[in-house]
Amino acid sequence: MPSLRDIRNRIGSVKSTRQITKAMKMVSAAKLRRAQDAILKTRPYAQLLEQTLGRIAARAAADEVVAHPLLAPRAQRTAEVVVITSDRGLAGGFNANIARRTQRFLVENADRYERVQLATIGRKGRDYFRARRLEIRKDFTGVHANLAYEKAEAIAAEYTERYLSGEVDAVFLAYNEFKSAISQKPVVFQLLPIETPPDAGDGASIDFKYEPSREALLRDLLPRHVAMQVWRALLESAASEHGARMSAMESATKNAEEMIASLTLQYNRARQAYVTKELMEIVSGAEALK
């Protein structure tokens, strides 16, 4: 049976842990609000850009014209999956869920492509796949530190260049899609070639006038669209990470409080037993002296 000192030490240790988890929960909640604000600010621009590109692509398809190489279908022999995870842990199943979703995607598409490569954004994903001896073509380091749109642009530009050169035939983004603070959905999204939305053909019958030209607009807008998709995935992943960590730390804080209550009860019972034993010894000694 543990001594009173041992129980006191355990209570103190759990209280210290509770302070840490409570502080981490508050920090994650603040970061989550900022990430949500960034997503809301980005969404209108991304939606309008997607609609505009969809109309131009649909009109080009109606004219039986290949509008741009990024939109043109071709034989897909080599694919690459860019997996977005976090640099830090203590986020529940955030990293494990997207890693397992990626592995399932690799199995499901093993016959579709001659070769599927992996790239990672985030140390947790890199470590996960290395531990399973899966080759990682490239690890994008330092992306999560001071997350900025310029980093998304650089990643998008690299994959656009590799796609246009024929080095890779399809590029996918694997990330956690943010639903709420307690819900994140692991998804695999096709980045390249660009897929037009299902309702893109709604504006194909309207004879829009594009200046300087349809082709010039696509040359300018398509790289922005690819960069925006990468940026959106990074923001969604960041919000999902903070939400998952906030939930995990809230659960850890509650568990710590329950453990403190249990240890306190154990301490009081042990102390009561100790006092009772002392009193009995005193009474027994007094009786022996009579």
Swiss-Prot record:
Transmembrane segments: none annotated. GO terms for cellular component: plasma membrane; proton-transporting ATP synthase complex. The keyword Transport applies. It is a peripheral membrane protein. Keywords: ATP synthesis, Cell inner membrane, Cell membrane, CF(1), Hydrogen ion transport, Ion transport, Membrane, Transport. F-type ATPases have 2 components, CF(1) - the catalytic core - and CF(0) - the membrane proton channel. CF(1) has five subunits: alpha(3), beta(3), gamma(1), delta(1), epsilon(1). CF(0) has three main subunits: a, b and c. HAMAP family: ATP_synth_gamma_bact. NCBIfam families: ATPsyn_F1gamma (TIGR01146). Belongs to the ATPase gamma chain family. This is ATP synthase gamma chain. It comes from Anaeromyxobacter sp. (strain Fw109-5). The lineage of its organism: Bacteria, Pseudomonadati, Myxococcota, Myxococcia, Myxococcales. The gene is atpG.
